[in-house]
Amino acid sequence: MCCFIVSILLRNVRTPMQVNDLPVFYSFRRCPYAIRARMVINYCGTAVELREVLLSNKPNAMLTASSKGTVPVLVLPGGTVLDESLDIIRWAFDQTSSDLNKLDIRLCGHLSQSGTNLIELNDGMFKQALDGYKYWQRSPEKPQHEHRSEAEQFLQQLEVLLGENQFLLSDQLSLVDIAIFPFIRQFAFVDKDWFDQSCYPLLQNWLEHFLDSELFLNTMAKYPVWNGSEETRNFINL
């Protein structure tokens, strides 16, 4: 735990940078894809201009950068656009110092096949079941508990892994944990009473570890919605 806290506090040494030269990061605070990208950006100490958006009123600048209309979106100073959270995560690690990369090589994107498979399951089957569980009223022909049962197939896999190690792949935090955590958080809070009484005690403890962590609490700091004005420009890790 001490090593984990110390590693969060490490920050990349960089030369002074004008704020207008910073990468622009479009985010929505509660989006799980945006949360995992912000967590890694904060973990690495990568400086960005954060533009908090409302998904119901997406800014034209974001839509011009990425026609997908989803967050997160990262616009680099040279004009390159990254609009997939895992690509943004890999970019953030590329910006860190060599010392930080050595310390956190397990996080830098060179995933084992088992780690890659877990993230693919999370972003595919589990996310689909999660959406059905959370927004079941959109398709009422399938009851909510059926969506939850489908999602539980993934929870069961995670519970088994946590029976072997403190985190999903080992006794050390990995990119896999950060990539999956925001989605388990979203699932749990659909019906927190049910989740807290479910047969996943190890997953419950794993979730609480992240919810109480300095990394997550800093990541979830509230910022004003960006409207193009100087007052709504936010800068993190400067």
Predicted regions and their residues:
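Structural helix-adjacent loops and short alpha-helical linkers that scaffold large soluble proteins
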Residues: 106-108, 194-198
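GST superfamily/GST-like fold recognition
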Residues: 168-193, 210
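Short helix-capping/linker segments at secondary-structure and domain boundaries
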Residues: 45-47, 140, 187-195
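Surface-exposed helix-capping loop/turn segments at secondary-structure junctions
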Residues: 160-171, 215-220
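GST-like domain detector, emphasizing the conserved glutathione-binding G-site
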Residues: 9-153, 159, 163-166
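Acidic/histidine-enriched, glycine/proline-rich intrinsically disordered or flexible terminal extensions
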Residues: 223-238
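Extended, well-ordered alpha-helical scaffold segments
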Residues: 146-150, 198-212
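Cysteine-centered motifs
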Residues: 2-3
